[in-house]
From Swiss-Prot:
2',3'-cGAMP binds at residues 159, 164, 230, 254. 3',3'-c-di-GMP binds at residues 159, 164, 230-233, 254. The chain crosses the membrane at residues 17-37, 45-65, 92-112, 121-141. It is a multi-pass membrane protein. One of its GO terms (cellular component) is autophagosome membrane. Keywords: Cytoplasm, Cytoplasmic vesicle, Endoplasmic reticulum, Golgi apparatus, Immunity, Innate immunity, Ion channel, Ion transport, Isopeptide bond, Membrane, Nucleotide-binding, Phosphoprotein, Transmembrane, Transmembrane helix, Transport. Residues 387-398 have a biased composition (Polar residues). Coiled coil: none annotated. InterPro entries: STING (IPR029158), STING_C_chordates (IPR047191), STING_C_sf (IPR038623), STING_LBD (IPR055432), STING_TM (IPR055434). It comes from Danio rerio (Zebrafish). This is Stimulator of interferon genes protein. Belongs to the STING family. Residues 1-16, 66-91, 142-398 are cytoplasmic.
Amino acid sequence: MSVMGEDALVPRARSRLPVMCAAGLGFLTLAVAWLLDSDKFSERAGIIAFGLMLERFIYCICLLAEELLFHSRQRYHGRMSEIFRACFRGSGILGMCAIFLMLMLGGVSFSVKQWSHFNLMCAGYMLLNSLGVLGPAPVEISEICEAKKMNVAHGLAWSFYIGYLKFLLPALEVNVREYSRRERLSSPRLHILLPLNARVPSKPEEEDTNVVFHENLPDLKLDRAGVRKRSYTNSVYKITHNNETFSCILEYATPLLTLYQMSQESSAGFGERERKQQVLLFYRTLSQILDNSLECRNRYRLILLNDEHTGDPHYLSRELFQNLKQQDGEIFMDPTNEVHPVPEEGPVGNCNGALQATFHEEPMSDEPTLMFSRPQSLRSEPVETTDYFNPSSAMKQN
């Protein structure tokens, strides 16, 4: 579910723009180099490319030494093929060998001076890499973690969905239907609050006195992970705003408690800035998961709460009021209620919910017959001649 103003807060997935820019600048610099000195350009470019790939290959050998000596059994079960795939890229090795063969077949002879240049390039690469100068930038690390779904937020979002929302939301619909027989709910959906600062109070009344606990829905009891009849409870709250009172099912996203407590532990290496980014990623990931879930579709509402509301004691009730008002204009489709066609009046009948027309059937003749129609001009306008649509013919029959 979308929340008003979320585009200004929730980060979008990163695009391929850096790769495209790097490729464009690479071709541009190659063109400039060729214009400056076109003498043996392909030979010099091949030698430089071979040197760059060689230094990366030597660094991968250093990675291989670590994996072979200390991690071959625990991480790879002694399988050398997996160790090599983890340390080397097949495309890099093939590219280096292909460039070397092309240079040799092209008649290029590597002199002692050129090998000395290769040694200096490899030495400089090793030293700079060991000092962290050539390491990935924070943006690159973030991009890799997001692309591989390796962030804390990804795990928490999937855990919240698989371990709670996936089975709770379909079952909650039954409780809401029973509750609505005796009391009115402003919305049948579960409203999940996600504060950006990850500070989750034990009671919403602590944040806003206009949000008051009303009562609990009947418990949902399931056998989960060895616990017999584990109880899951949802609460109904009354929200007052501008002398209007609304009621809805409300709760905070409990995984945000984990993010907040991690930021308080020095061993977690999780600062306030990282915590906010993880909350936004949690919101984005959970939204994508729930949007693609048939069990949860149209049964929830994610409400992202901006923490820039210091001094407003009724911020929460105002946000809930706006979301509930926004839902008033939406059509809530109950997937359990099937829509049946309405039968038309007249010769059209209804059989098991399907429209069925009745026509007068005549016995078919075995003798072939010829049917002729009156000739019409090819340029004439089409005229409806059936009795149903032609009032003149209908009047003649009457």
